[in-house]
A protein has these predicted regions:
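Conserved catalytic-core element of eukaryotic-like protein kinases
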Residues: 230
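Active-site activation/catalytic loop segments of kinase-like enzymes and analogous catalytic loops
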Residues: 262-303, 317-336
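Conserved catalytic-loop position in the HRD/HxD motif
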Residues: 233
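Juxta-kinase regulatory segment immediately upstream of eukaryotic protein kinase catalytic domains
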Residues: 2-31
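Activation of the activation-loop gatekeeper triad in protein kinase-fold domains
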Residues: 250-255
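ATP-binding pocket architecture of kinase catalytic cores
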Residues: 38-211, 219-220, 224-226
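Helical subdomain adjoining the active site within ATP-dependent kinase catalytic cores
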Residues: 305, 309, 320-366
Length: 366
């Protein structure tokens, strides 16, 4: 998969999309033109992103990005794309913290103009650790950096998480609480169970994912800790870097209200996902980047909060990623790019890692 073509993600006509976007922008800035249109080279297969230049003498910015809810005909990754929610989160993060987020410009909740709700934001300049091919492979800027430069990037990235969790008022994030009963962590996991049920509705279920849910219950934290604003898709592939410093934090569609460790577990495991794949293809990868022990130690230094139950939270991250990967695999089947194997667990790219986590053998004994 790491060397496979990127799965199809849309059925939209890009020229038609640009034409309709130009017409819509004309209602905000009469005479506005769209130029320099491009799609990001990597990172993200859920909401669609279109990069463009806004040409108008009164434009608030010239370099823009459009975030458009997924095309339902494209067998979307998630059942709901709440663009207004993302827009609100980004606006609030900018208002309450010094975390660098792109300036949001316009929100359109009416699906009429472009076929789905969307928002427009300022486009950040910089570079992003790639997903395809992953930054853990040779031949990209992060892999080519020095150890000191990668350490600087890691420290700055953990600083983003620390400031987000510390500076954002928890009460302002409560609108992100998942429905249901129980504390925020219980509601979060229950929502993931519901998402998994949606993914496997009418198709083969995953015994491994279900075993991972069972293992979560065995590892359930005695004290999940206070809830904060969780970025959600908290990984370096969703940050634009200026050199090795974060310039813009992107992709807030998974934002939620829950323990700090939700983001920490995701950050650690999503790097391990790429690292394990890279090692499996015979390359050393970046084994010293975002090590779990280093992340826990530095986060505690920055915030005074010692991360707890990280075996639970890294397992939960791997489980959540498995559900997403299963949906992506079934989307490839939908578009005729793949067939359903006899064992559906083979569609989970990190099957071996998740199996080891379920057994309790993935992380070395302390």
């Amino acid at each position: 998969m790491a060397t496979a073509p990127r799965p199809r993600t849309t059925t939209r006509d890009p020229e038609e999309l640009v034409r309709r976007l130009t017409a819509w922008l004309g209602t905000r800035l009469p005479g506005a033109r769209v130029g320099g249109v491009a799609a990001p080279a990597s990172n993200g297969m859920s909401s669609e992103t279109l990069l463009f230049d806004l040409v108008h003498p009164s434009a608030p910015v010239s370099a823009c990005a459009l975030r458009l809810a997924a095309d339902p005909a494209a067998y979307s990754v998630f059942p709901v794309y709440d663009m207004a929610r993302q827009y609100r989160v980004m606006r609030l993060v900018a208002e309450h913290t010094d975390v660098p987020v792109p300036r949001v410009l316009w929100l359109e909740e009416d699906p009429g103009p472009l076929g789905a709700p969307f928002f427009v934001m300022e486009r950040a300049a910089g570079r992003v650790p790639p997903d395809v091919m992953p930054y853990t492979y040779e031949g990209n800027w992060l892999h080519s950096a020095t150890d000191a430069e990668r350490a600087r990037l890691q420290d700055a990235t953990l600083g983003v998480l620390a400031r987000l969790h510390d500076q954002f008022p928890a009460k302002e994030a409560r609108f992100l609480t998942e429905p249901g009963t129980g504390d925020p962590l219980r509601r979060h996991v229950d929502a993931q169970r519901a998402y998994y049920a949606w993914v496997v509705d009418g198709v083969a279920r995953s015994p491994l994912i279900e075993a991972a849910f069972d293992r979560l219950e065995e590892l359930w934290p005695q004290d999940p800790g206070p809830a904060v604003l969780s970025w959600g898709d908290a990984r370096i592939g969703n940050i634009v870097y200026d050199g090795f410093e974060p310039a813009a934090v992107l992709d807030w569609e998974m934002a939620s209200y829950g323990p700090r460790e939700l983001d920490l577990g995701w950050t650690v495991y999503l790097h391990r996902f790429f690292q394990d794949l890279t090692v499996g293809f015979g390359q050393p990868g970046l084994p010293d980047l975002l090590r779990r022990d280093a992340v826990e130690r530095r986060y505690a230094e920055l915030t005074g909060h010692t991360p707890g139950d990280m075996e639970f939270h890294t397992l939960y991250a791997a489980l959540r990623h498995a559900v997403v990967m299963l949906r992506v695999a079934y989307r490839q089947v939908h578009f005729g790019e793949a067939r359903v194997p006899e064992d559906p667990d083979t569609m989970i790219l990190h099957r071996a890692s998740l199996e080891a986590m379920v057994r309790g053998t993935y992380w070395p004994a302390p």
